[in-house]
Every structure is written in structure tokens, then in C-alpha cells.
Amino acid sequence: MELANTLRQDGESRGGVLAHLERLETQVSKSRKKLEEPQNAQALEARIHELKRLRDKLRAEVKQRQARVKASTANVEPDQILEISEQEILERKQENMKAILQAYRFTGISGKLTSRGVCVCISTAFEGNLLDSYFVDLVMEKPLWIHHHSVPVFIPLEEISAKYLQTNTRHFLFVLWEYLNAYSGRKYQADRLQSDFAAFLVGPLQRNSLCNLLSFTYKVKPEGQSFPFCARLLYKDLTTTLPTDVTVTSQGTEALPSTWEEQRAAHENLFFTKPLHQVFTSFAKKGEKLDMSLVS
């Protein structure tokens, strides 16, 4: 009886110890979790604090930059800003003009910079002979405009300027050079005809200011006979030195012999394809001697 009681007491004692140990382990686990929770919270709080600090720093830098920009433009009026941008545009145009003059220096177009822009010189030539030169004084403003020039009044300068000066200065100069160079070439031919072949003309050479309409009477002496021809040359294209329309007729109402008609047609073709002075030179080379009886 006593042994049974002892065993029961021992069992209860061991069971109580084990239960107590389990309770202690549970309490320790709960205590550890409670200790870890504040540590995690502290870490999160530190991270949040660091992010806020970085945010405030970035905001401060942005405000400083905005303040510097505002300070730099505080004393600049809108008109001044516009003037600055226009000045930059004009400077770029000036640089472009330098490049254009450099590219055209071998074509007869040259120039120099002035206090207000650039003065362009357009030199003309024909068959290797240097002829007249003209100038155009351009003012580099917005819009670009011509201050002075020596272009003849019968050259359509205003029309050319209206088309190209504001949009394509390079093309404006090229087109103007074409007109001036062709005019000088036509004038050179007419002058040569009058100076070198005046003795072979019947009456004066008639021409207009542009030298794009010429009419004259000349003689050749085929087969010992003298017969005058009347020539009319029209240059519809003012940028060319050869006529677009040529008419050669006989003077009088008499019908031409067949040989003279052939010569008349051949002369028309020559006037279409050669400068005036070269046409008369070719007559001599082919044995078509001009009527020397007209020389006085």
C-alpha cells in the first residue's frame, strides 16, 4: 500500500516538473518575440527617418536651383530675351553668308563683312574676258534687306529678292549672278559686233537696254555678188547669252536664189549656236567674205 502511494507520488512529481518546463519554454519564446518586435520597429523607424532626410535634401536642392534660375533672369525683360534670340539668328546668318561667299569665290561672287552686314561683289565675264562688276550691300537684320546696290534698273532685282532673299540667300546670289553675267555677255557681243564688224553692217545695230533684242542688216558677197540680209535676235531667257528666237530675212521683195536661201538658213543656225562675233568670224573662215564695198 505504501509502495503504491510512493509510485503515484513520484509520477505526479515527474509530470509536474515536465509541465513546468514546458511552461517555462513557452514563456521564454514569448519573451524573445516581445524583445524582437521593438528591435524591428526601431529598424523601420530608422529607415523611415533616413528616407525623409533624403527627401528633404532633394527638395532643398531643387529650391536652390530654381532660385538661381530666377535670379539669373530677374533683370532680363521679355523683349531682351527676344532680342538675344534674334541676335543669335543674325549671327548664324552672317556665318552662313561667309560660307556662301567662300563657296562662290571661284564663280565671280565675292564679298566682305561690314558693320551692318556684308557687301557682295558680283563680277561678270564672257569667253574668259572679265567684264563689269556690280555690288549689293546687304544688311543683316530681320528681315534681310538691301541697303545699296549698283544693279542696272532693267535687271529684275526686286522680283529676284522677293522670291529668294529671305528664304535662300545662296540661291538669290546665284540667280542674280546669272542675270548679270548673261546681260554682260550679250552686251559684250553687241559691242564686239559694232567695233570689229562695223564696216560690214548696213546701218546701225539696234538694241535695247537689256541687249536681249538685237536687229541689224549685214552683207555677204557670195560668187561676186552682194546681197543684204536682215537679222533679228531675241533672247527670251534673260539668263542666257544665245538667242532663243532668230529670224534672218532678205532685204527687198525679190526672191532669193537657191544658194542664197541655203546661206540664209545656215546663218540662222549659226546665230542660234554661236556668239555674234564668232558668227562673222566663221563666215570668213568658210570663205564667205563680207561685202568690203561697204567700207568707206
From Swiss-Prot:
Residues 17-105 form a coiled coil. InterPro entries: CENP-O. The keyword Coiled coil applies. Component of the CENPA-CAD (nucleosome distal) complex, a complex recruited to centromeres which is involved in assembly of kinetochore proteins, mitotic progression and chromosome segregation. May be involved in incorporation of newly synthesized CENPA into centromeres via its interaction with the CENPA-NAC complex. Modulates the kinetochore-bound levels of NDC80 complex. It is found in: Nucleus; Chromosome, Centromere; Chromosome, Centromere, Kinetochore. Transmembrane segments: none annotated. PANTHER family: CENTROMERE PROTEIN O, INNER KINETOCHORE SUBUNIT MAL2. GO terms for biological process: centromere complex assembly. This is Centromere protein O. Belongs to the CENP-O/MCM21 family. Component of the CENPA-CAD complex, composed of CENPI, CENPK, CENPL, CENPO, CENPP, CENPQ, CENPR and CENPS. The CENPA-CAD complex interacts with the CENPA-NAC complex, at least composed of CENPA, CENPC, CENPH, CENPM, CENPN, CENPT and CENPU. GO terms for cellular component: Mis6-Sim4 complex; nucleus. It comes from the Eukaryota. Keywords: Centromere, Chromosome, Coiled coil, Kinetochore, Nucleus. It holds the Pfam family CENP-O. The gene is CENPO.
